[in-house]
UniProtKB/Swiss-Prot annotation:
Lineage: Bacteria, Pseudomonadati, Pseudomonadota, Alphaproteobacteria, Hyphomicrobiales
Membrane-topology annotation of the record: Multi-pass membrane protein
Entry function: Catalyzes the phospholipid dependent N-acylation of the N-terminal cysteine of apolipoprotein, the last step in lipoprotein maturation.
Entry's transmembrane regions: 8-28, 34-54, 69-89, 105-125, 136-156, 178-198, 206-226, 507-527
Metabolic or biological pathway: Protein modification; lipoprotein biosynthesis (N-acyl transfer)
Annotated EC: 2.3.1.269
Species: Rhizobium meliloti (strain 1021)
Subcellular locations according to the entry: Cell inner membrane
List of catalytic residues: 287 (proton acceptor), 351, 405 (nucleophile)
Main location: membrane
An example Gene Ontology molecular-function term: N-acyltransferase activity
Protein's name in the database: Apolipoprotein N-acyltransferase
Assigned protein family: Belongs to the CN hydrolase family. Apolipoprotein N-acyltransferase subfamily.
Keywords from the UniProt entry: Acyltransferase, Cell inner membrane, Cell membrane, Membrane, Transferase, Transmembrane, Transmembrane helix
Length: 531
């Protein structure tokens, strides 16, 4: 292995870039649906050795010194995001006549852009690089900053953050109840990269001991927390039915199918309860499951009232339209409705975090002049974004915190208001992406939000994966991908949070400071020894 490390260190030019790409591609295997945890323990040491091989000439200008580490980081990121996000292209094939031209931009262009974040990560790391275990701290620092920025710059896209690879199952998710994803990103990179010290690096014992301690604490805390009694059912008990209709996206886009789609949802809503289950108090339909503007269809509301039993509530995704005033086109919102047993809309919440190019077109005036449009181009201006996300109060007083579609991948979306709710709600339609890694990755990331908030999650997905997840991230009941049907269960209760959002943010910045100090001191010592 030492010989292999030496060969990787000596690589240069295209060979070094290609190995960086392969290392990033390998790292994808640590994410769902593969969950091959060991892959990260190979890919990140390779990245360390590639950076070890960068020896810029002090006489070079700043740009020439930055290019080699930036190229390594970008190639690693390009491989990682290409291997992890290729399935986004499926959405463009649903209406291939209109959007197939954009496949290269989505499948190759987006990973190329996202790779710039990892280029920054490696540039930061290389500026603090040394020959000891401090360089592992430098790499963790660089990735921590890059992933933090990826979470909010340009609307944010923290999909497949490195930290998720360290949390493949509920046993290893419990740290998210103490620290935020940004902190886990940093510590995960430290642990994943530490094996590089076995063959190359001074102070290997110290670095490996810290990594082993972090990994042991991560797993041991999971064992401890899952050994505690499971959250008791919410009192008074509330039985939830989640509907998973499995409707092909092409059918959803066909206006002629609207009535049959609506009736399909109603038939699943009225299906007999499963063995041992109580009559549902709340029925949940997926995102955009109501295939028309509900407020323009009183007959549809009457049909819902016919199907719902006394006291039942329907929570369903739909497009909501709002009059914008004289002479202006109406505003459309991707929304969730609360409908009571009389067919009355008694609550609604609109999506806050829209998907660029999917639900709206950034720089619309400029890009439409170039002939571009969003997937939601059938609505003038696309969807509008809500400014706030309310906690929805259901008839009877129960409260839910709605997250529509990919809003559930943003850890920061689960703010203090989420703790006011009895349950998190995630409704989505992943039929756009077909039977690919995308829906599995989406579900895994949503699952973590329940752990962070200490609050159970109800998840309804058109084609799957639908589930009820308890406050520890444990699946209470689940309906796998492409299985049509319903799931009925009693909603579990909440758990006390061990730290609040402000404390988790403070821990992140404290960890950032510690890693910087370790890397900077190690770098200083390296410079002194070298001179």
């Amino acid at each position: 292995m030492e010989r292999l490390a030496g060969r990787i260190i000596l690589l240069s030019g295209v060979s070094r870039t290609f190995v960086g790409f392969l290392a990033g591609l390998l790292a994808v295997l640590a994410q769902p649906p593969f969950g091959i945890f060991a892959a990260a323990f190979v890919s990140f040491p390779v990245l360390v050795w590639l950076i070890d091989g960068v020896a810029p000439d002090p006489g070079d200008g700043l740009l020439r010194r930055l290019m080699p580490p930036a190229a390594i980081g970008w190639s690693f990121g390009f491989g990682y995001f290409l291997g992890g996000l290729w399935w986004l292209g499926n959405a463009l094939l649903v209406e291939a006549d209109a959007f197939a031209w954009a496949l290269p931009l989505t499948v190759v262009g987006l990973p190329a852009v996202l790779g710039l974040f990892y280029a920054l990560a490696v540039v930061i790391a290389r500026s603090l690089w040394s020959d000891g275990w401090g360089r592992i701290a430098a790499l963790a620092l660089g990735f921590g900053i890059a992933e933090w920025l990826r979470g909010f710059l340009f609307t944010g896209f923290p999909w497949n953050a490195i930290g998720y690879a360290a949390m493949p199952m509920p046993l290893m998710m419990q740290s998210a109840s103490v620290v935020n994803l940004s902190t886990i990103n940093m510590l995960a990179v430290f642990v994943f990269a530490a094996p590089a010290l076995i063959w190359t690096g001074k102070g290997a014992r110290a670095g490996l001991a810290i990594a082993a301690a972090l990994f042991t604490a991560h797993v041991a805390f999971g064992f401890y927390r899952l050994a505690q009694p499971a959250p008791a059912p919410l009192q008074p008990e509330m039985t939830v039915r989640v509907v998973q209709p499995v409707i092909d996206q092409a059918k959803k886009l066909d206006d002629r199918e609207r009535a049959s789609i609506f009736e399909d949802h109603l038939s699943l809503t009225a299906a007999p309860v499963q063995d041992g289950a109580k009559r549902p108090d709340i029925v949940v339909w997926p995102e955009t499951s109501i295939p028309f503007i509900l407020t323009d269809n009183p007959d549809a509301l009457a049909r819902i009232a016919d199907v719902l039993q006394d006291g039942q509530v329907l929570v369903a995704g739909a497009v909501r339209v709002e009059d914008a005033g004289a002479g202006l086109p109406p505003r459309y919102y991707n929304s969730v409705y609360v409908i009571d047993d009389r067919g009355q809309i008694v609550g609604a919440a609109d999506k806050v975090h829209l998907v660029p190019f999917g639900e709206y077109l950034p720089f619309e005036d400029l890009l439409t002049s170039w002939g571009l449009s969003s997937v939601a181009a059938s609505m003038p201006g696309g969807f509008s974004a809500a400014s706030t996300r309310p906690v929805l109060t259901l008839p009877g007083g129960r409260r839910i915190y709605p997250m529509i579609c990919y809003e559930a991948i943003f850890a920061d979306e689960v703010d203090g208001n989420a703790r006011l709710a009895d349950a998190l709600l995630n409704i989505t339609n992943d039929a756009w992406f077909g039977d690919t890694p995308g829906p599995r990755q989406h579900f895994h990331q949503a699952q973590l939000r329940a752990v962070e908030a200490g609050t159970p999650m109800i998840r309804a997905a058109n084609t799957g994966i639908s589930a009820v997840v308890d406050a520890r991230g444990v699946l209470v009941v689940v309906l796998g991908y492409n299985y049509r049907g319903v799931i009925d269960t009693i909603l579990p209760g909440k758990l006390p949070t061990l730290t609040n959002i402000a404390t988790r943010s403070q821990i992140f910045w404290l960890t950032t400071g510690i890693l910087f100090l370790v890397a900077a001191i190690s770098r200083l010592g390296f410079n002194i020894r070298k001179n």
